[in-house]
Amino acid sequence: MLFNGTTKYRDYAIVISLFFLLNVYLLYNTAQHTQVGNSKHISSDSGEKTSNPLPSCEITDDLAKSAISRAITPSCKAKLQLEACQLKNGTFTINFPENQCPNHDSRLIDQRIGCFLDKKEARVLTEFEYKLPKSNGKATCRKHCYKAGFLYFGLEFGHECFCGNDVSNATAVDDVECRAYKCPGNENSEEFCGGFNAVEIFRTGFRSKVNHRKPTYLPPSSDSIKNPVKILFLLQLNGRNERQVKRFLKSIYLPHHYYYIHVDARQNYMFSEMQKVADFLDNIHITERRFSTIWGGASLLQMFLQVIRDSMKIEKFKDWDYIINFSESDFPILPISDFERLITVNNGKSFLASHGYNTGKFIQKQGFEYVFSECDNRMFRIGKREFPQNLRIDGGSDWVGIHRNLAEFSISDEELPRKLRKTYESILLPLESFYHTLAFNSEFCDDLLMSNLRLTNWYRKQGCRCASLKPIVDWCGCSPLVFREETMKKFELQKAISKPTYFARKFDSMVDIDSIEAAEMQSISPEKLQLNHPTYHFAFANIFKTGIDEQKLHFESLANFALKSTETRAKFRKVLRIDALRAHHNALIEIVMKIETTDGATFEFLIHRLSHVNLTENEEKLVEHGYLLRAVSFGTKFEWKEELCREYMGFVTDNDTLHTRLQWHPTEHVKKVGDKTSPEMIFKYRKGDELIEQTVVKPYDSVFGGQFDSWNVGKKLSNLTTCSNFFVDIISPSSPDDAPPLATLHFPVYTDQNAHCHVDYLRQFFKIADFCTSGDACKEKIWSTSYPDPKSDIFVGYDEDTQTLI
């Protein structure tokens, strides 16, 4: 009986185990075919046919265990488990074919140069160094130096691997000096890894160092362009500022090119607005096959490749010569006709930006040594990567201009692109290096011009703020800043010509519309611009639209409050839309809200936010360690690199993190400590007179003079059913205990439970400045979303007479 019972339980255990594994596989498979909303959401394989074995290992790698523990959905956990097992079992790495670039010569691989004197202060190979205490050897060192494009590799001191391109000044020593240390990669072999101050040098397999060619500026000509190329302009859109996108589209539109629009799968408002634009023009296509293109995600490359595939199947679009991608924050800084001429003259070449520095360092900074996996709208780091022996890596920017021949090769089923696509599913920021790497390992290596013809507004000390990336990627990276008055000089005409650069980024009309105007006047004929139009300096960005976004109680409270200010008897039905308005780059942001009443009437309101900040009247007391406190503000959805809150309305709910920003200005008496631009301060958070929390805010380094504290409202506050007043006191650490604060900020917290308090809050923090009650009346209000805005309006299509979109 005992034997039979044990057998039965064993059978049950087997069945349960098989059922569990089947469920894991099905969950993973489901994750690969998830649809988001009404859009076709593409999985990371994007059509690649792969066979995924079931996970069958114990995860021991700390990175993988951490990633799996942080994943939210079962399907994501299953995906990470599967890939971590493949990595552990050695089935993750792919063997690549031999490099087909003419600069590669297999006869040069491991060709010995000799043994040379080498010292720390006078290295022979100076470009890059790897420390490989467990794996160093000829094959390993050669692999690392080859992937970075170096001509030579050298072994020394057992665990040291050096890379470089020049051995002309090397001093030869006796070969026995390079046989002092066995290679740690295989202690039982007779392979040696150099000596003490002696490096043994070999060839990696490249014939010569590559000198990148760059395009040169072509001056405007009255002669028409012969056989102009057909460009597929790919607009990769995010956000809700559709007016800026339409303004950009108007600046680059020519009827003989194609415009292919991809909108992030999470941005349904932008998608709906772009659909309206596509209805007017046959050469504009908006794809319904949408990806969530998170920062650094594999999905960005998958989207780009899918656009190539899909565009070749559309009859009206399939004969393009180039695909060139842009974002919602790009703008031309030279005429589009000049750009078209340069591309045509260089037809056949692809335009790729180089990283501009040592390739070994680039590989290191980009995280190529690690395996990443995208799911749950995040890039998880799951382990170290084992690179194949013969893959040359390069990269730079993910803003590219790809010729048709290279584009077709990239989606083909040939061995190199097929295997590279698979490998790049697990590489961070894949579009920044995929086409570089594909070209440098193929016959296309000589068909490159190393410039993407763009100017990027880098300020890395400010743009490399990792805090904003923590929720979406297990890595730290950089993003460019928005052009402002002080950085517009970067794209002045002569500078743009000298590079040449035909486009620049980033532009944001809600931050500084003047920079867009400067670029526009440099790239577009003045007669096509309506510089004197009342809304020329206006910037709008949508916040809410009915049918797309979820109605929120505090929005409805504001709508009711606004409606009651008109003394109408009409009853509120729903909010139709809310937009942020900035009348010029120095103006405060205003709110434009459009609502519908129960009788079908519409009202549109201009609403001003009221600040509740009390600064001490004695300016001398606002100076702390030589820094003058100029302003205090608060908000949510904080953007670290631009130092502003993207929630323009000023609402704080129990689901938000409150960000309080101090604006400092250095005086002549400032005592700077390092690079810091602000002093240490104390923030006291109060509910009425009750102290909730006190935090010490350390000095901060900001190009804009900002200093911040983040406070999670939901975690810090509870039982928000009463009409409480909340405050932040800004206090100097050197002040006596009874001294008044330098400043006090007053803010409300809106919850569904304290809806009866909303009117009280709204009365304190908002003012109804103006309103209109019909479509015709609102068209006369300059602040209304119905008022004409010719710089971005597209209501008809292409006008042959003016040669513009109208």
UniProtKB/Swiss-Prot annotation:
Pathway per the UniProt entry: Glycan metabolism; chondroitin sulfate biosynthesis; Glycan metabolism; heparan sulfate biosynthesis
Catalyses: UDP-alpha-D-xylose + L-seryl-[protein] = 3-O-(beta-D-xylosyl)-L-seryl-[protein] + UDP + H(+)
Question: What is one process in the GO biological process aspect for this record?
Answer: heparin proteoglycan biosynthetic process
Any S-S bridges, and between which cysteines? Answer: C57-C85, C101-C445, C464-C478, C466-C476, C772-C778
Question: Could you tell me which InterPro entries the record lists for this protein?
Answer: Glyco_trans_14 (IPR003406), WSC_carb-bd (IPR002889), XYLT (IPR043538)
Q: Null-mutant phenotype, please?
A: Worms are infertile because of the failure of the progeny of homozygous mutants to initiate cytokinesis and because of the failure to form an extracellular space between the egg and the eggshell.
Mostly located where? endoplasmic reticulum
Any one cellular-component term (Gene Ontology): Golgi membrane
Cytoplasmic-facing ranges: 1-11
Binding locations of UDP-alpha-D-xylose: D264, T293, I294, W295, D398, W399, S479, R505, K506
Residues with an annotated glycan are N89, N169, N325, N614, N655, N719
UniProt feature coiled coil, ranges: none
Location in the cell reads: Endoplasmic reticulum membrane; Golgi apparatus membrane
Q: How does it sit in the membrane?
A: Single-pass type II membrane protein
Q: Where is each WSC domain found?
A: 109-205
Enzyme Commission (EC) number: 2.4.2.26
Q: Which residues lie on this side of the membrane: Lumenal?
A: 33-806
Q: Which GO terms describe its molecular function?
A: metal ion binding; protein xylosyltransferase activity
Q: Which residues cross the membrane?
A: 12-32
Q: Which UniProt keywords apply?
A: Developmental protein, Disulfide bond, Endoplasmic reticulum, Glycoprotein, Glycosyltransferase, Golgi apparatus, Membrane, Metal-binding, Signal-anchor, Transferase, Transmembrane, Transmembrane helix
Q: Which cofactors does this protein require?
A: a divalent metal cation
Q: What family is reported? A: Belongs to the glycosyltransferase 14 family. XylT subfamily.
So what does this one do? Catalyzes the first step in biosynthesis of glycosaminoglycan. Transfers D-xylose from UDP-D-xylose to specific serine residues of the core protein. Required for vulval morphogenesis and zygotic cytokinesis, suggesting that glycosaminoglycans play a central role in vulval morphogenesis.
Check the record and name the PANTHER family matching this protein: XYLOSYLTRANSFERASE OXT
* Name of the protein described by the UniProt record: Xylosyltransferase sqv-6
State the organism of origin. Caenorhabditis elegans
Q: Which gene encodes it?
A: sqv-6
